[in-house]
């Protein structure tokens, strides 16, 4: 009987859903921060007289910070623990969000957005691998997909802020920026309610602490369900109780070793494809709607409709990922995204753009639900946070490039050309997943990574 077998046999119940809520709120505010910038751009442009190129740099600031934050969070998460990184990242993000709100000029605002993005990126990269280590294999796809679904609530909140706060007050865009710092209020709750990952504790040789976490979770699950716990199954794969020290060089060496190179290449490409397409679309959709002849306020209303389509996208993909595997779910939703992006490229009225944009929003965000479930599953525990962080960081290269590329090329390519480019990127992702993706549904984290452990010995 192993500690992790005891953990994996627990039925999902109130203690798991509390973890889902805690992590989900983190993703809600990450999503809000990522999306709100699109609604700040017109006001910032008017106040500081910014060019389209400068607006593109602001749009790229948060994902640029995400890149560094995700990389650092992964490395630290495998060294000092997932919980500490989550809390430090949240505080860092909130401080620089407030600084951005009171920025006196473009330069200070840009730097503050980059640093706030680093905090948000660190938090975002660590939540999914952290919580995936608490969830039984048979429900992990749904759980992490639903966790990622909280991003959609943040985007809807951003759209509502853009519609009702930004145009209502003289400094509405600054007030909106202050609102993004509110998650600082969650710190005390997180400190009291979040346990450290027992898988991380075992890897660090802290078996007594891991036992305490699992025993406490067992007690709470039994109390919540009012039933005896299921029997502990025999396990074929034992967890390792020691691991190499992780730094950036050793991590990259392992991730691109023969045992891991295929997995790493597929995951990194998927992250690049989805973030390039996602940020290229959502960073510019209000501005593109304005350029199609509607008012800024009306463009924000259309954006709310588009953002609302994210919610069923996330949760439908979370449901499907347990039934047709993460790999197939990602391929299906990427294909839907490609078709939707092409459809959007052919539209020329605000209403048809909004409808096509809502469908694209549904499929893009469904893809994200699959990706957030899939990524932590392919890396061993000792490097799970680092692997997830580096994958997310590489994806942020796409999100950095997309707003700037679209901002600079929209004049020459036009509306159709911009989304034609997005279609081509998405098609490449579909082919990659279908041909090279790994099936993961219903398998324990230790089983999925058993063969890769040989590369560390």
Feature-to-residue mapping (PLM):
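Transmembrane-helix signature of 12-pass secondary carriers
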Residues: 1-457
